[in-house]
Amino acid sequence: MQMIHKEGWIEVICGSMFSGKSEELIRRVRRATYGRLKVQVFKPAIDNRYSEQEVVSHNGNKVCAIPVERAMSILEQWSEDTDIVAIDEVQFFDEDVIGVVDYLADHGVRVICAGLDQDFRGEPFEPTRTLMAMAEYVTKLQAICPVCGSPASRTQRLIDGKPASYHDPIILVGAAEAYEPRCRHCHQVTNKPSKLPETASSGE
């Protein structure tokens, strides 16, 4: 992608679980450090699946990160001489992260955010959705559906091997034991209400 010349912008890397979001974030961070740029990496403290102080991709690549409980802590620990701020699993942050990211970009920082763009229901995931609208650059990655082999853009939550209910909590930190990528047609959510108006869904 062609980069803008003025300093400070937002990049969003999004997609389903196992689509390579953290891997792509790590790749961009490493590329920047090779170029002698100062990078700070942040992650939500709730995400301790593989490491408490590293961003770790599902294939084992890793980069050191600062775990924070809330979005404003990113600003509190941000160094003004930092060129790039990278934020992994951005969907786990409170909505203050939107203002934090915007502030950093306005103050000359290249901000790289990686996160799920849809929740397990297949619905837009905040704050990723808003950040995608604000971003100068959006990269949407896809995994492979293990059921049919098609490109997978959704995340299937499994509870004891069965599809989760629509009414389950949105946030449940997990990996392959609880989630797998699915295409639109193989993605299943029990008790999911229709999004059509009643007149349309009843065929009238």
Curated annotation (Swiss-Prot):
GO CC list = cytosol
Provide this UniProt record's keywords sorted from A to Z. ATP-binding, Cytoplasm, DNA synthesis, Kinase, Metal-binding, Nucleotide-binding, Transferase, Zinc
Q: Show the GO MF annotations.
A: ATP binding; thymidine kinase activity; zinc ion binding
Q: Where does this protein chiefly localize?
A: cytoplasm
What is the name of this protein? Thymidine kinase
**Chain positions recorded as Zn(2+) binding sites:** C145, C148, C183, C186
Q: Provide the E.C. number(s) assigned to this enzyme.
A: 2.7.1.21
> Which enzyme class, named as a word?
transferase
Family membership:
Belongs to the thymidine kinase family.
Q: Where is the active site?
A: E89 (proton acceptor)
Residues engaged in binding ATP: G15, S16, M17, F18, S19, G20, K21, S22, D88, E89, V90, Q91
> What's a Pfam family in this record?
TK
Provide the protein's localization: Cytoplasm
Subunit details? Homotetramer.
Reactions performed catalytically: thymidine + ATP = dTMP + ADP + H(+)
Q: Which Gene Ontology biological process is one annotated for this entry?
A: thymidine metabolic process
| NCBIfam families registered for this protein in UniProt | PRK04296.1-1
Disulphide linkage map: none
